[in-house]
Structures are given as structure tokens and as C-alpha cells.
From Swiss-Prot:
Disulfide bonds: none annotated. It comes from Acinetobacter baumannii (strain ATCC 17978 / DSM 105126 / CIP 53.77 / LMG 1025 / NCDC KC755 / 5377). Binds 1 Mg(2+) ion per subunit. Binds 2 Zn(2+) ions per subunit. Zn(2+) 1 binds at residues 75, 77, 90, 93. The lineage of its organism: Bacteria, Pseudomonadati, Pseudomonadota, Gammaproteobacteria, Moraxellales. This is DNA-directed RNA polymerase subunit beta'.
Length: 1397
């Protein structure tokens, strides 16, 4: 390993040597010798520069003798000047004659008069010095800051090593024992103790000790110490180097002193901190020379320690040292951490030359790959190219002349500019760049004016609009950069969105409106019923006004269709269409059929059209087509004359009657409230309900009124036709506006919310057309302001989420074609509440099959494994009736670094199998983060009013089909129907092909009316249940007998006034008298065969049978009312996504069964129930204490499976991973994240979420090391463990046992192998301290590390460079081996020859 400083020096060799290539960077502790080897001399004085001459003081902090000359090739006293004396050292002032920039790299040093502990290794938790010495941080600090003595060598005295003595104890001991023992204080003492540690002996002692340790805390501490000691042993770091004897001094140009006008100076804080250290150090030296009293020396040493602490990390210990203006000084640690630190400000984000920015305006005449660049800007950006061209063509003799010409802007300069710009792409960027489409390349077209012109179709990708947005322009300089910009970043190559694989170059707003307008049809328009020979004839008729653009006519069209085999066929057909659609047909490329455009072109339809064009005809045709669509749309929107007027907002005539009716209902409820029939809460809920319903009714009336008009047709009868109302057309086409907005314009504004989120019960009955009263306006202002405040918060939070995601996934790159695994995820259609939300074809599209796909009906192989599923195959799968496919997934990928192409599948932005080197991690992070700002920030309070949907109480099917049970356990009731006794059962409905169309959850105790495999008609009811109670269902028949159910002790009888029926209700434990506290009420069934079955009754159970009654199988013997679910906050939107990715444990999460077995309840403790599970396999009994207020869903004697829910609540992802495995966890996280995005209508491919989950599952906890090198309790990379276990198994030894760990994204980012990446993310100090102590090597495998060290990244086109480096490295290693052997051979033969036998 070379020293980093040598590398830096090599880079700056003026002889033009190539920079040193390196493959890894190691960080470690610097020994005093090493610090001196870097140094060019000792800084002895605190002076900086002479304030009159501005020359640096000798031996001071800016000394030219140590750090180098201030001016290029000129010594300080001026004896030697110019290049010819290069390398001469002036005998007068001692300065070497060289370039001044060595002052940026030459370091100095300070010889400390007393050792000083490095604050990072002392105070950065856990304290490394403390761990090594096995002392507490407080004790060490007392020694370091001269409060106590520590025994470093006890000799023959009763003291122990590491024992602390205060002054009195020390002097008493001195009197008693004299110099038989040694005790010291300060950093010297700590340094001696560290020197004395025998790492080898300690390590072997700890290795023996760990297996015998019983206490958990001791074990943790011992294994931590062991890890640290081994790290020291392996890394060639010595523990005593954590205490410094020599302090390095930063090169002066990195802590500059700049003279300001008025004789003052601006200086870096570091100079103040160094001055403080030097002053105290010099004073200490003087005191030691004078043999000053101990107490004074001690104080000086303590002050020296404190000043070095402040220099390294100001404010970590005690109060931060402040400058003259009461602001804490910026120390070395502050220089590198945080957003303004070295990492994030200068290494990961740099400013670039050859860039400019300006306002953007719309460029409707541009082609998709073009942008308009103002001439002024282009002239400045392309200057070097222009200079070179002017010189080459002989128009200017020198660069200076060329410069003059450009400044004068002579005519020939413009000609040169035009030729330079031809075919030279520029990159446009709009901040915030949330995904890779925020930076795209275009060909510049020179324009007058000062604004950049942007093609309207790329606005969606940039999220740009023309209300004053600015964009930046960057010029790719090298040929390679130009090539990449053209081949990869050109806007024409980015038609599909990387997030979901759908077109992102889709017309919006005016274009959509124009296309929609010309493809509408109208009843009885001019020329209806005409027949045309071809589209040209239609054009002529339109131009001469013979036919209206919306008329219904017949036209003969020629179309080219691509058949099954990919061949093109010509067809001629006669179609019913309109002249407007014929206009559109003229721009549609060959290969698309006419019926794709023979309909109203809403935004959705246009998107579909572009998508199928891309899939069928490829990139080039799509780009041309998109441009043509845009030109046509703009032109026709202009000609349509669609505008917005007051008259367009039609208020429905029935509005007032609907509102009057609602007001009457509200009055009735008010009366009921006054008479005491309903409570205040109920009244409020009902009123809010009524108004919400009324608002919907008004909106419906308004939309009906707005969307249809009555017209006379040719026969003179009235016919309904879609309205040509401007506002309605805008909304219907998807150009602008939504039903909700039109409702506010022409319906009623409806209910408003108060600042705390509660709804104000009096709605705004007016709409914007009628106008609002002052009060109504005032009520509505709150929502508007909250919206603005929310947006600001949301942007920050969303950005932070994206940053964490990028950081955790940045090193995931496609590294190999196929890892060969057969693991993966089983994909089924995503069904929720009976609706197919995402069909199977959408979920498997672009994935690779993990095993053969077989048809459900005859088990025939439809698709072999390893096939990439495209649109065609997905359609075939659907036809074959396949309803689950096992596909490869990044979760199961077995590549060591990165993932393989087969596990990832299709590259969504390109539409084919992903290329090696594609940076899929960053793509995933951007795809999830980019829509973040569209998500809501609020947490919803779900209370009475908001949970408007009535609880489901039956399964009613929508489609005819066959009933399928999914893990449903049932018992047969006497009346003939089945009763469900399983908790996680589901019912599916399959169509005639065997594809599942619907799926419903089936609660415990539901009555099932059909059997598995029976047919059901559409609308048939399959199962019913009571949504408000939990039934207790008997699984055997017998006679009921009450046990420990005593009135007034454990139960209470209630008689219903209305019905006169008496019911027995079990009392809660808290409400029972003392005698009933320990009783466990139960119903015992004496079965017919003489056995007994106990049913223990939870608190609040309503018993529905009488003592001695005969009971059949499946009867309900008791009901537990479900607490009207407590108002609980549902976290929605962005915070929910963040919670999922941070793997946070939810409050009051669901309790799952840890093992499979029979449930029973043990002895209760105060406030908690004891749940006992007796496992099926006879292993040890599992017990858990559950708080009494938790509702427990299982009953005594019931059988549960591992991972089944015992008590409801939000799921805890860690439990899912532990009990159900990583596939179940992946499905849970993917579905939960998708729920949030779906609610906002954002489409993200599952793949992206899986990529992040893979990174969250990187680490495992070692439970038992076996014969591997891992220690129990250690955290290791999953892939590493798997590989080491395979190696160990091959030798027939014991592999390590481990448990997968789920880490939140922040923690996962920090636990990455690369310390550079972790340090530049968060907690810089902690990461660097840990890395330095353990002597970590960074292999520079991720993207971030390589950006920081300034190399090409190992992704995309940079991957080739890295693979080549790796290959060379492997070859060099092999070569070295051969060399060693040949040398040994030579030596051996020489020895043989020299011996005289």
C-alpha cells in the first residue's frame, strides 16, 4: 500500500508522469514516525505573517522554509528567481525554489511536549481507548484531564493495574510503598497502559472466556473487545498510536489567511486553533525546562490536551472554543462532515465549467431531439472550440487574435459557431433532478433572444413548465462524452420512464385537447352519411367545407398490419369514422391498425397508442410519430376555439331541491339530539354524512347536466350526445381539470376542514360561479394555506427519503448475465377486496421465469424456465389460464457483488433484457423517490366519521365462476352449511379457464354457503358473518356446562328491556371482586364419547347458550364484541413509505405465533395474560406475556401455525422476516409501499422496491459460528456467510448458523463495506473513527466511493475500465507467484552446484 501523500505528489509531478493507478484505499492510525515522514519541518512559533511586509514569519504557521515559496520559482528573500534555479535551496532564507502550489500539499508538524489523546478515539462512542483498556470513559477522562492517578505498574503492592487513586490515596501509598509501584496521570499514563497491552494474549484469553460467559452484557462487551483487539492485530495499527506525540499541521494554502482592505485579515478558524496549541505547547516546554511546580505543569498539560481536542473536533468535549464573534470555531472534523463539509460539498457535488443557465420558453416548432440555444450563450459555451476552429481555418493567427474576434462578434465568428455546433449535443438539466430524465441531451439550434427553448413533449420528464422555470446547459467536451450524450442521453432515446416502463413522451394539455377535439363525433353534423374513396378526398371535402370535422362518414382506408410472424400485410377496409380521425390517420405510421385511432383520443388512449407504436415499430418511428402528433394537436387546438366562459359552468337546476332536502334531514337530526335520542358525537357524524352525500348528489346532477346535450338527429328525433362544452371537454380528454374541480366551479364546494383536521359541519353550499360570501371564503382559506405549508415540508422530506434510498442502493449494479439460481417470487394477480387491482400479466411483464410454467388444466409446459416475458408472452399466459408464475427476483439473486441480469429482468427504460453495468440500484431509488413530492404528508385520523365505509359482512361475488378455498379450515354445521375455523383463510373465484378473478378474506366463524369447487353465479353470496363480534365456534358436539361462571363474581346477567331476553356477560378482570380475580370462566362441553372440551371465555364475552343446553358442531356459544375500533392514526403517504423502508416497529403491532402448536393460557400476572404454545414437534414450550387490553383472537385449545396472527394490529416487518421468511417480507413491503403510491395514482414497478428490500436484507446475525471464522453475535454480509458455509461444507465441517437481519435504509447505508460511502452519508466522525481503528480497506466497488476519489464509476461505460483493472490485478498476482517459484529454483540449483559432493 502506498502512502496517499505520495500518490498526491506523483499526480502533481511537473514532468508529466501519469497519475498512479490504485485499486483500494486503506485508512489507519498514523504513527509518530509516519507523521514526521510527511512533514517538511517543525512549526515552532504561533506567528503567521508579518503584518507590514505580508511575508510569512520563519518557523511560524505559514513559514516558507517548511511549506514552500509564496510566489512561483522565487525564494523569500528574492535571491533566486525564475525557472532556471528550480530545486535550489536558498542559503539565506532556506526556501526551496519551486512552484507555489506545493503550499497546498506540504505538511508540517508540532512536537508535543506531552502526549495527547486523540479525542475521536476517546469520545466517539463506543470509546475505543475505553474498550481496549476495559475502563469506563469517565475514569479515563479523569486520568486524562489530571483529576486522578492510574496505577500503570503495581509491582509487589496490593494495588491492581488500572486502579484509580486520587491525590490523597496516591500520597498515602507513596509514603507506604515508596517507589515499588508506578502510578501516573494524563495522556502519558494512558499511553503506557496502551503500550503494555499484549494483544495476542488478550485475544486468546477472550476467546476462551466468551463460551463460558452467562451474562448477556458481559458477553456483548467481551465480543466487542475481541473484535477490536483482532482488528488491531490484523491491521498493523498499534493501540498507543491513539495517543499522539506529534501533531501534523495542515498545509497553509488549505487554511488561508487573506488580507482584506483596511489592513484587516480574514483567516480560517484552523489558524486560531493551531496558534492556541503552539502557544500552550511552547509554554509547557518552558515550564518543563524551568522544572516548575507539578500543579502548574499539570494545568498546562491539561490545557494542551483541551486545545488539541478543540483543533480536532471542537465542541465534542466541554464547551466549544469560540472566536472573537462568539461563534464556535470550525475544527478539522467540521471541515469534513455535514452538507457543507468536504465530502458532500466538494467531492460528491462539484461545480462544472462550460455551463450556463437561463429561463426556458416553449419551442413548439422544434423536433424532439432539438433545443433552442440563445446565440449569446452558445458563443460563450463553445469558446474553446471556436478559437481552435478560427485558428485552424487561418482566420486568426493566434489564440489572442481569435479571442479579440469573438469579443467583437465579427460575422465570421457566427459562421464558425454554426459549424462548431452542428452535431455537437448539449445537455439540459432542470433542478431538482429527481430522476435520470432530469438531465437529457439535445442538439442545439441557434436562436435569437436570451431564453432557452424546450420541446413541449419533454416537459413531463423534466417536470418543467414555462412560468419562469430556469434550466442549466452543459457542454460535453471530449469525444467520448459527446458519444455518450448522443447514444444514451439524447431525448429521443428516453421515451420510456425507468419507473414503470410506460411512455413518458406523451402529449399533454393543449395537444391532448386538440387531438380529442378532432376525434370526437357529432350527431347530424354537416355531411353525415357521405362515403369517401380515400383520406385525400376527405381532406378536400374538409377544405372546401362540404363536410364538418365531426360528421359520421364512411371512408375506405388502406392499412398495413403486422401479423403473427412479424410480416407486414396490406389491407383495404371501409370504416365508419369522422373526417377528424382521418386527419389523425395521416400522421400514424405504417404498421398500426385504423381501429387504434378510430375512437375519442383521450390522454389515456394517446398513451396507449404511443406505447403500442414503440413496442411494434421501434424507436425511430415512435419519435417521428410523437412529433407529428404534437404539431397536429397544437394546430387543431388552436382551430377548435375551445375557451372557458362563465356560461360554460352550467349549474344543475336540481341543485336547490337537493340542498333543501338535506337541510330538512339535518333539522330532524337536530331535533332528535335535543330530545336526547342521539348523542352529540352521533349527531355530528350523521350531519357530516348527510352533507358528504348531498355534495356527491349535486356533483352527479351537475356532471349529467354538463356532459350530455339533446340534439335533433336526421330523422328529427331527439338524441343524447356527448356535450361540446369547453370545460367538460378539457376534463373528459384528460387535458386539464378533474371532476372534483368542476364540482367546485358549478356544483357546491362542500365540506371544509378545520386546522386540526376535523370537518366543519356546515358546508359551503355555493360554488365559484355563484360566488362565496365573506364567511364562506374565510372558512376555505385555511385549507389553501395548509396546502402551501405542506408542500414546503413535503419537498424537504421527500428529498431526504430519496437521498437515503440512493445511498443504500448506490452500489447495486448488474455485474453478470446469470447467477444460475432457481429461487424467486411466486407472482399472483394482486387482488384487494375482490377487485383485481393488478392482473398477472402486468406483474410478470419484463421478468424471467424461474421454473417451467405449466398450464393448470393439463400440466403441460407453456413456458420453459429462463424465458423473458414480453407483452406477447404475457398475453399467451393469460389465455392459457395460468394464475401464478414463479419469476426470478433480485431478492433471490446469488451474485456476490451487484445482481445478475436474469434476476432483474427487463430494463424498463429500454424494453429489453438489462445490460451489464446498468446501475439498477440508483434507478430504483430515483423511481421510488421521484414521485415522493406527490404523496401526502398527513396522517389520517380514522375515527367514527372518517371510516364511512360500512363494515363488510358477506362475500358477494361479481363474476360467475368456481369457488376455491385457500387455507380454509371448516366444520360442518347441523343445518348443513360450513363454518370457518381458520384465521387466515381466503375464498377465491376462478373463471372457466381456471384463472382467479376475485379473492376475499374469510374471518373466523363465518358461515360458508357453498363448498370448495362449487359453481356460483355473478352476485351470489358465498359467506356471511357478523362484522361486529368475534364468535366462539365449537368444533365438537355435546352438552354445555358452565364452569366458574358465577353471577356477580365473574359474570353479570343483563336483561334487554325491549326484548326481555337475559344474557350472561363475562366481567373484565378489573371489574370483578377479589374472589373472582383468579377464576377462569369457561364453558365445558361433555362430548358424546365421554371426553370434555374446555372453551375459556375472554373478558366481555356474551354467552349465547344456557347451562345444560345441547350443542351441535359449529354452533356459536359466545360472542366477543369487537371494541368499536379505537380512533387510531393511519400513517399515510410519505411518512408511511419512510417507515416501511426504515423497517420501524409499529406501535401496538400484531402479535404472531412464534411456533406451531396448541394454544393455552397460563397463570395471569398483573395486567398481562400469559399465552402458552405447546409445539407439535415436542420441543420446549413457548410462553409470552400479552397486555390484557390486547384483544386475543385465539381460544384455549386451538391450533395455530407459526406466523399466524394471535392479536390484531399493524404488522411488524421484523416478525414477518423471522417467522415467515424473506419472500413473505418482500411481498409485505412491496404491497404496502405500492398501496401508498397507488392511492396517488403513481405507477412504480415492483422491481424497484425489491431492489431496496435486497439491500435491507444484506446482513445476517451469526447465532453459532460453527467451523467458520465468524464469532457468535457478529453481523456479516449474507453473501459472505453463504460462500464461507459452502467452503466449510466442502471440507465436511460445521457451517455457521445465522438469522437474516432486516435493517432500515439509514442503518444499512452506514453498515456498508465501504467506509468512504458511509462517511459521506451520515455520522462521518463515527464511521471514520471505526474505520481507522480497524484499518479498513475500501475496495472502491460502489459508485459513490469512486466519485469521491475521482475515478470512472463501475457502472455503464465505466464498467469496462474497472473490469480491465481487475483482470490486470489478477494477472499480476499470478505473475508474482511464478516469479517467486523461479527465484527459489535458481537459488536451490546454485546451492546444489556450489556444494562439492
Amino acid at each position: 500500500m502506498k502512502d496517499l501523500l505520495d500518490i498526491m505528489r506523483k499526480k502533481t509531478d511537473s514532468d508529466g508522469h501519469a497519475p498512479v493507478e490504485f485499486d483500494r484505499i486503506r485508512i489507519g492510525l498514523a504513527s509518530p514516525e509516519m507523521i514526521k515522514s510527511w512533514s517538511h519541518g517543525e512549526v515552532k512559533k504561533p506567528e503567521t505573517i508579518n503584518y507590514r511586509t505580508f511575508k510569512p514569519e520563519r518557523d511560524g504557521l505559514f513559514c516558507a522554509k517548511i511549506f514552500g515559496p509564496v510566489k512561483d520559482y522565487e525564494c523569500l528573500c528574492g535571491k533566486y528567481k525564475r525557472m532556471k534555479y528550480k530545486g535550489v535551496i536558498c542559503e539565506k532564507c532556506g526556501v526551496e525554489v519551486t512552484t507555489a502550489k506545493v503550499r497546498r500539499e506540504r505538511m508540517g508538524h508540532i512536537e508535543l511536549a506531552s502526549p495527547v489523546a486523540h479525542i475521536w478515539f476517546l469520545k466517539s462512542l463506543p470509546s475505543r481507548i475505553g474498550l481496549l483498556l476495559d475502563m469506563t470513559l469517565r475514569d479515563i477522562e479523569r486520568v486524562l484531564y489530571f483529576e486522578s492517578y492510574v496505577v500503570t505498574d503495581p509491582g509487589m503492592t496490593p494495588f491492581e493495574k488500572y486502579q484509580l487513586l486520587n491525590d490523597e490515596e496516591y500520597f498515602t501509598a507513596l509514603e507506604e510503598h515508596g517507589d515499588e509501584f508506578v502510578a501516573k496521570m494524563g495522556a502519558e499514563a494512558v499511553q503506557d497502559l496502551l503500550k503494555d497491552i499484549d494483544l495476542e494474549a488478550e485475544i486468546s484469553r477472550l476467546r476462551e472466556e466468551i463460551p463460558q460467559t452467562t451474562s448477556e452484557t458481559k458477553l456483548k462487551k467481551a465480543s466487542k473487545r475481541l473484535k477490536l483487539m483482532e482488528a488491531f492485530k490484523d491491521s498493523n495499527n498499534k493501540p498507543e498510536w491513539m495517543v499522539m506525540n506529534v501533531l501534523p499541521v495542515l498545509p497553509p494554502d488549505l487554511r488561508p489567511l487573506v488580507p482584506l482592505e483596511g489592513g484587516r485579515f480574514a483567516t480560517s478558524d484552523l489558524n486560531d486553533l493551531y496558534r492556541r496549541v503552539i502557544n500552550r505547547n511552547n509554554r509547557l516546554k518552558r515550564l518543563l525546562d524551568l522544572a516548575a511546580p507539578d500543579i502548574i505543569v499539570r494545568n498546562e498539560k491539561r490545557m494542551l490536551q483541551e486545545s488539541v481536542d478543540a483543533l480536532l473536533d471542537n465542541g465534542r468535549r466541554g464547551r466549544a472554543i469560540t472566536g472573537s464573534n462568539k461563534r464556535p470555531l470550525k475544527s478539522l472534523a467540521d471541515m469534513i462532515k455535514g452538507k457543507q463539509g468536504r465530502f458532500r460539498q466538494n467531492l460528491l457535488g462539484k461545480r462544472v465549467d462550460y455551463s450556463g443557465r437561463s429561463v426556458i420558453t416553449v419551442g413548439p416548432t422544434l423536433r424532439l431531439h432539438q433545443c433552442g440555444l440563445p446565440k449569446k450563450m452558445a458563443l460563450e459555451l463553445f469558446k474553446p472550440f471556436i478559437f481552435a476552429k478560427l485558428q485552424a481555418s487561418g482566420q486568426a493567427t493566434t489564440i489572442k487574435a481569435a479571442k479579440k474576434m469573438v469579443e467583437r462578434e465579427t460575422p465570421e465568428v457566427w459562421d464558425v459557431l454554426a459549424s462548431v455546433i452542428r452535431q455537437h449535443p448539449v445537455m439540459l438539466n432542470r433542478a431538482p433532478t429527481l430522476h435520470r430524465l432530469g438531465l437529457q441531451a439535445f442538439e442545439p439550434i441557434l436562436i435569437e433572444g436570451k431564453a432557452i427553448r424546450l420541446h413541449p413533449l419533454v416537459c413531463a420528464a423534466f417536470n418543467a413548465d414555462f412560468d419562469g422555470d430556469q434550466m442549466a446547459v452543459h457542454v460535453p467536451l471530449t469525444l467520448e462524452a459527446q458519444l455518450e450524450a448522443r447514444a444514451l442521453m439524447m431525448s429521443t432515446n428516453n421515451i420510456l420512464s425507468p419507473a414503470n416502463g410506460e411512455p413518458i413522451i406523451v402529449p399533454s394539455q393543449d395537444v391532448v385537447l386538440g387531438l380529442y377535439y378532432i376525434t370526437r363525433d357529432a350527431v347530424n353534423a354537416k355531411g353525415e352519411g357521405m362515403v369517401f374513396a380515400d383520406t385525400h378526398e376527405v381532406n378536400r371535402a374538409l377544405a372546401t367545407g362540404q363536410v364538418a370535422i365531426h360528421a359520421r362518414v364512411k371512408v375506405r382506408v388502406h392499412q398495413t398490419v403486422i401479423n403473427e410472424n412479424g410480416e407486414r400485410e396490406q389491407q383495404t377496409i371501409i370504416v365508419d369514422t369522422t373526417p377528424g380521425r382521418c386527419l389523425l390517420w395521416e400522421v400514424v405510421p405504417e404498421g398500426l391498425s385504423f381501429d387504434m385511432i378510430n375512437l375519442e383520443m383521450t390522454k389515456k388512449n394517446i398513451s396507449k397508442l404511443i406505447n403500442s407504436c414503440y413496442r411494434k415499430l421501434g424507436l425511430k418511428d415512435t419519435v417521428i410519430f410523437a412529433d407529428q402528433l404534437m404539431y397536429l394537436g397544437f394546430r387543431q387546438a388552436t382551430r377548435s376555439g375551445v375557451s372557458v366562459g362563465m356560461e360554460d359552468m352550467l349549474i344543475p337546476p336540481t341543485k336547490h331541491t337537493i340542498i333543501d332536502k338535506a337541510e330538512t334531514e339535518v333539522r330532524e337530526i337536530e331535533q332528535q339530539f335535543e330530545q336526547g335520542f342521539v348523542t352529540a358525537g352521533e349527531r355530528y357524524n350523521k350531519v357530516v354524512d348527510i352533507w358528504a352525500r348531498t355534495n356527491d348528489q349535486v356533483a352527479k346532477a351537475m356532471m349529467d347536466n354538463l356532459s350530455y346535450t339533446l340534439v335533433k338527429n336526421k330523422q328529427g328525433e331527439d338524441e343524447k350526445q356527448k356535450s361540446f362544452n369547453s370545460i367538460y371537454m378539457m376534463s373528459d380528454s384528460g387535458a386539464r381539470g378533474s371532476a372534483a374541480q368542476i364540482r367546485q366551479l358549478a356544483g357546491m364546494r362542500g365540506l371544509m376542514a378545520k386546522p386540526d383536521g376535523s370537518i366543519i359541519e356546515t358546508p359551503i353550499k355555493a360554488n365559484f360561479r355563484e360566488g362565496l360570501t365573506v364567511l364562506q371564503y374565510f372558512i376555505s382559506t385555511h385549507g389553501a394555506r395548509k396546502g402551501l405549508a405542506d408542500t414546503a415540508l413535503k419537498t424537504a422530506n421527500s428529498g431526504y427519503l430519496t437521498r437515503r434510498l440512493v445511498d443504500v442502493a448506490q452500489d447495486l449494479v448488474i455485474t453478470e448475465p446469470d447467477c444460475g439460481t432457481s429461487g424467486g417470487l411466486v407472482m399472483t394477480p394482486f387482488i384487494q377486496g375482490g377487485d383485481v387491482i393488478e392482473p398477472l400479466r402486468d406483474r410478470v411483464l419484463g421478468r424471467v421465469t424461474a421454473e417451467d410454467v405449466r398450464r393448470a388444466s393439463d400440466d403441460e409446459v407453456v413456458l420453459p424456465r429462463g424465458t423473458l416475458i414480453d407483452e406477447k408472452i404475457a398475453a399467451q399466459l393469460e389465455e392459457a389460464g395460468v394464475d401464478e408464475v414463479k419469476v426470478r427476483s433480485v431478492i433471490a439473486c446469488e451474485s456476490t457483488f451487484g445482481v445478475c441480469a436474469k434476476c432483474y429482468g427487463r430494463d424498463l427504460a429500454r424494453g429489453h433484457l438489462v445490460n451489464p453495468g446498468e446501475s439498477v440500484g440508483v434507478m430504483a431509488a430515483q423511481s421510488i423517490g421521484e414521485p415522493g413530492t406527490q404523496l401526502t404528508m398527513r396522517t389520517f385520523h380514522v375515527g367514527g366519521a372518517a371510516s364511512r365505509t360500512s363494515a363488510a359482512n358477506s362475500v358477494q361475488v361479481r363474476n360467475k365462476g368456481t369457488v376455491r378455498f385457500h387455507n380454509v379450515k371448516t366444520v360442518q354445521h347441523a343445518k348443513g352449511h360450513l363454518v370457518s375455523v381458520s384465521r387466515s383463510g381466503e375464498i377465491g373465484i376462478a373463471d372457466e379457464l381456471g384463472r382467479e378473478r376475485e379473492r376475499y378474506k374469510l374471518p373466523y366463524g363465518a358461515s360458508i354457503l357453498l363448498k370448495d369447487g362449487e359453481l356460483v353465479e355473478a352476485g351470489g353470496i358465498v359467506a356471511t358473518w357478523d362484522p361486529h363480534t368475534h364468535p366462539l365456534v365449537t368444533e365438537v358436539a355435546g352438552k354445555a356446562r358452565f364452569s366458574q361462571i358465577a353471577d356477580g363474581v365473574t359474570a353479570t346477567s343483563k336483561t334487554d328491556d325491549a326484548t326481555g331476553m337475559t344474557t350472561v356477560e363475562i366481567l373484565p378482570v378489573t371489574a370483578r371482586p377479589a374472589s373472582g380475580k383468579d377464576l377462569r370462566p369457561a364453558i365445558v362441553l361433555d362430548t358424546t364419547d365421554g371426553g370434555e372440551q374446555f372453551y375459556f371465555l375472554p373478558q366481555n364475552t356474551i354467552v349465547t347458550v344456557r347451562d345444560g343446553e345441547t350443542i351441535g358442531v359449529g354452533d356459536v356459544i359466545g360472542r366477543v364484541p369487537q371494541e368499536s375500533s379505537r380512533t387510531r392514526d393511519i400513517t399515510g403517504g410519505l411518512p408511511r413509505v419512510a417507515d416501511l423502508f426504515e423497517a420501524r416497529k409499529p406501535k401496538e403491532h400484531a402479535i404472531l405465533a412464534e411456533v406451531s402448536g396448541i394454544v393455552s393460557f397460563g397463570k395471569e400476572t398483573k395486567g398481562k395474560n400469559r399465552l402458552v404454545i405447546t409445539p407439535d414437534d415436542g420441543s420446549e414450550i413457548y410462553e409470552e406475556l400479552i397486555p390484557k387490553w390486547r384483544q386475543i383472537n385465539v381460544f384455549e385449545g386451538e391450533h395455530v401455525n407459526r406466523g399466524e396472527t394471535i392479536s390484531d394490529g399493524p404488522q411488524n416487518p421484523h416478525d414477518i422476516l423471522r417467522l415467515k421468511g424473506e419472500v413473505a417480507l418482500t411481498n409485505y413491503i412491496v404491497n404496502e409501499v405500492q398501496d401508498v403510491y397507488r392511492l396517488q395514482g403513481v405507477k412504480i414497478n415492483d422491481k424497484h422496491i425489491e431492489v431496496i428490500v435486497r439491500q435491507m436484507l444484506r446482513k445476517v446475525d451469526i447465532i453459532d459460528g460453527g467451523d467458520t471464522s465468524f464469532i457468535k453475535g457478529e453481523q456479516v454480509d449474507y453473501i459472505r456467510v453463504v460462500q464461507e458455509n459452502q467452503a466449510v461444507l466442502a471440507q465436511n465441517k460445521f457451517p455457521a448458523k445465522f438469522e437474516r437481519q432486516l435493517m432500515g435504509i439509514t442503518k444499512a447505508s452506514l453498515s456498508t463495506d465501504s467506509f468512504i460511502s458511509a462517511a459521506s452519508f451520515q455520522e462521518t466522525t463515527r464511521v471514520l473513527t471505526e474505520a481507522a481503528v480497524t484499518g479498513k480497506e475500501d475496495d472502491l466497488r460502489g459508485l459513490k466511493e469512486n466519485v469521491v476519489v475521482g475515478r470512472l464509476i463501475p457502472a455503464g461505460t465505466g464498467l469496462a475500465y474497472h473490469l480491465e483493472r481487475r483482470r490486470q490485478e489478477a494477472e499480476a498476482a499470478e505473475h508474482a507467484l511464478h516469479n517467486d517459484f523461479s527465484e527459489v529454483d535458481q537459488a536451490f540449483s546454485q546451492a546444489l552446484n556450489s556444494e562439492q559432493f
